[in-house]
Regions:
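C-terminal interaction-tip segments
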Residues: 1-30, 34, 38-40, 55, ...
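Intrinsically disordered, low-complexity repeat tracts enriched in Pro/Ser/Thr
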Residues: 18, 22, 47, 54, ...
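Short, surface-exposed beta-strand/strand-loop-strand elements in extracellular ectodomains
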Residues: 42-66, 153-177
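Extracytoplasmic low-complexity repetitive segments enriched in small/polar residues
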Residues: 44, 60, 100, 106, ...
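Intrinsically disordered, low-complexity Pro/Gly/Ser/Thr-rich segments with frequent PxxP/GP/PP motifs
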Residues: 55-87, 170-200
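Low-complexity, intrinsically disordered tandem-repeat tracts enriched in small residues
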Residues: 24-26, 76, 83, 130, ...
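Short connector loops at helix/strand junctions that flank enzyme active sites
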Residues: 30, 44, 85-87, 141-143, ...
Length: 227
């Protein structure tokens, strides 16, 4: 697996809309190890990370995580292991100008057998289960992180709000998150979870739309002697 370690440094004076800071090039996968954001403005800035999944929607970004504040002359280090595939984009939205952002990342060949992958999507279904991720035939998925954000404008209350793992062979399921999800709040699941071929991660939220990002590894399922 060819690896190239790189960084980027950029500034922006754009306020009120997301600005693309990094796009994954063709034939590559990009994995961030850390991002630093410095506020050069005299006022406190509120920022929001945006992601674009080119395979899902080439024009609309999703909000990744909650917004955060940085006081004047201070920096914030973000250690999220964000993954971008070919054509995917990382952006930032700020309400103040004079913002400086840098990031460290590794570029990998996307043709490798073990692939680092990313899905971001906007879900417009409410009160019904939606497939967020499914392990394809002949492959195993190792899910590293799932973030779901309520962007409906309304608090989603009650135990009908649920994330669950569905096992393909018997169609049995196990909920791993359930309960209220207030407007502009997130559910952040970081426990490693393995999906065998056909297994699914599903969500049901009582309000819509909501934003979902998932980072995972996908690898061929090896044949095991005696199995």
């Amino acid at each position: 697996m060819s690896q190239l370690f790189k960084n980027f440094i950029a500034t922006t004076n754009v306020t009120g809309s997301a600005v693309t800071f990094k796009e994954c090039p063709a034939g590559k996968t990009l994995v961030f190890s850390g991002i630093t954001s410095f506020n050069g403005n005299a006022s406190t800035v509120t920022q929001q990370i945006h992601l674009l999944d080119a395979s899902e929607d080439a024009s609309n970004t999703i909000e990744f995580g909650v917004s955060y504040n940085i006081s004047s002359g201070n920096a914030l280090f973000l250690d999220e292991k964000i993954v971008l595939e070919e054509g995917d984009k990382l952006g930032f939205e700020s309400d103040q100008d004079t913002q400086r952002i840098s990031g460290s990342f590794v570029l990998l060949d996307s043709s490798s057998k073990t692939r680092y992958r990313h899905i971001s999507k906007i879900i417009t279904t409410e009160d019904s289960f939606v497939d967020l991720l499914e392990a394809p035939a002949g492959h195993t998925i190792i899910m590293k992180q799932l973030i779901l954000k309520n962007k409906s404008g309304t608090n989603a209350t009650g135990t009908d709000n649920e994330l669950r793992l569905v096992e393909d062979t018997t169609n049995t399921f196990v909920p791993f998150a359930r309960g209220n999800l207030n407007n502009n709040s997130i559910a952040n699941f970081t426990n490693t979870m393995v999906l065998e071929p056909g297994d699914k991660i599903q969500s049901r939220i009582t309000e819509q739309p909501y934003h979902v990002s998932i980072f995972f590894q996908e690898l061929p399922t090896p044949s095991v002697r005696g199995q």
